[in-house]
Structure formats: C-alpha cells, structure tokens
C-alpha cells in the first residue's frame, strides 16, 4: 500500500500565502521551472519521493524540494502528523548554498505554523 501525503501551504496570520505568491511569480517569469516545481510538489504526495534527488533534509525538521533550471528553485517544507506536508517558503538562487536569511525565514514560518496549529488544538480541548 502506497502512503500518500497531503501538501498544504503555510499562511500568515493575515492570510497571505508566501509559497503560493512565489509560485504565481514563477509561473509568469519562468513557466518551465514553475511546471517542474508544481510537479515536484505533487510527487511529494508519494512517500517514495521524500529523498534525493527530489527532496533533501536540511536539519531541524526542514526539507527542500529542489529544481535545477536557469536558477536553483527551492521550496522548503516540513512533515506534520496525519501524513501532511507543509510548504513554508520558496526561493530562487544561483549558488548551491542556501542563504542563511532564507533558511531563517523558512524556520520562522515553520515555528509560527506549529505554534498556531497547537494553540488551535488546545482551544478545542478546552471546549470539550
């Protein structure tokens, strides 16, 4: 039996969706890279694709989906209970290394999502 995962996008408190915004810009500027990244996100639904060359662990629970085109296109994500993948940040860069500030943005968004997710669960428990 193949284990499938749901892929979700992080949203800010204000309702902005940075990964969707990143993908929308990519669709206009580099349609081929956009198509490859969207196909990669779809492949992440299959557990067998959670490793290289499509995906790579970065530490602290974060992973990257990577597409090499004119520039390296990366989407950072993490696992969540219930077979969920949460995509938190997307970047394009020329180098192989991930800039520290981009990793920090991805980590902050992951921690923000986790904080809000667990606060919501606590609200439901207290209502029971």
Provide a role label for each language-model segment.
Residues 1-72, 81-85, 92-128:
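Basic, Lys/Arg-enriched alpha-helical interface segments
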């Amino acid at each position: 039996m193949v284990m499938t995962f749901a892929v979700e996008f992080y949203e800010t408190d204000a309702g902005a969706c940075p990964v969707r915004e990143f993908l929308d810009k990519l669709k206009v500027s580099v349609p081929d890279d956009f198509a490859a990244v969207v196909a990669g996100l779809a492949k992440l639904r299959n557990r067998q694709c959670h490793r290289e060359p499509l995906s790579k662990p970065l530490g602290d629970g974060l992973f990257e989906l990577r597409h090499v085109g004119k520039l390296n296109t990366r989407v950072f994500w993490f696992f969540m209970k219930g077979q969920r993948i949460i995509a938190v940040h997307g970047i394009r860069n020329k180098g192989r290394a991930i800039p520290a500030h981009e990793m920090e943005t991805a980590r902050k968004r992951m921690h923000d999502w986790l904080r809000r997710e667990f606060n919501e669960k606590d609200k439901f428990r207290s209502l029971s």
